[in-house]
């Protein structure tokens, strides 16, 4: 679109569309940045609507901001330095990611949702309108609120992704283990590991618990 600015070491994949007044690949908004040669990588088939702002990475964060394939990014979205986004993500108008945020495949961030730095937004999760998120979000979980809290499983999203009723039921069981059983986190993880032996859809919960460095919404 007209008046788009693409600057810095920025790579844009095939069939990606950028609409007017977007700023793509500008210097990171980080006081530690001192002109280093960092980059922004955007994958294929991604839509970037009007007035979006995407920053390059910082040396301290690995030097790259990465946005995957088939993402739908609506107007006025901000993606800060060193964020890593997977594929098939939806970010609605004015959603914002602070630095070093990771977003998993198929996550949905509703309008005006704000994600604090270093958070991990799990795959297939749903962040409701105007939620303020300062902890990581496990896979499959819906969160909502000015101080975001877990509200259940994103069942509608899973149905749209082709999960069958049995798979969705197992995800709900895993949610109850983590959120309603009263088990300590270590005990809940052991139970999830046992469930994952027969139900592969539980595996993302365990991977999340093993890899997320920030406290998560529980």
Where would I find each of the regions flagged by the language model?
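Structural signal for interior beta-strand "rungs" in well-ordered beta-sheet cores
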Residues: 1-149
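Terminal amphipathic alpha-helical/low-complexity segments used for targeting or macromolecular assembly
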Residues: 15, 21, 32, 37, ...
């Amino acid at each position: 679109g007209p008046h788009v600015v693409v600057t810095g070491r920025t790579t844009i994949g095939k069939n990606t569309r950028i609409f007017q007044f977007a700023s793509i690949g500008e210097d990171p908004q980080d006081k530690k940045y001192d002109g280093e040669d960092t980059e922004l990588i955007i994958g294929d088939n991604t839509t970037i609507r009007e007035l979006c702002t995407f920053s390059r990475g910082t040396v301290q964060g690995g030097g790259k901001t990465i946005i995957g394939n088939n993402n739908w990014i609506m107007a006025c979205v901000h993606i800060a330095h060193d964020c890593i986004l997977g594929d098939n993500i939806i970010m609605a108008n004015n959603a914002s990611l602070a630095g070093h945020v990771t977003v998993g495949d198929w996550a949905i961030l509703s309008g005006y949702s704000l994600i604090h730095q270093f958070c991990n937004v799990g795959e297939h999760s749903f962040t409701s309108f105007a939620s303020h998120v300062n902890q990581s979000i496990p896979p499959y979980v819906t969160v909502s609120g000015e101080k975001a809290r877990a509200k259940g499983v994103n069942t509608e999203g899973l149905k749209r992704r082709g999960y069958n009723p049995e798979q969705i039921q197992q995800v709900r069981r895993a949610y109850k283990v983590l959120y309603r059983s009263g088990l300590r986190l270590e005990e809940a993880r052991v139970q999830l590991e046992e469930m994952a032996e027969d139900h592969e859809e539980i595996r993302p919960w365990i991977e999340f618990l093993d890899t997320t460095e920030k406290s998560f919404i529980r």
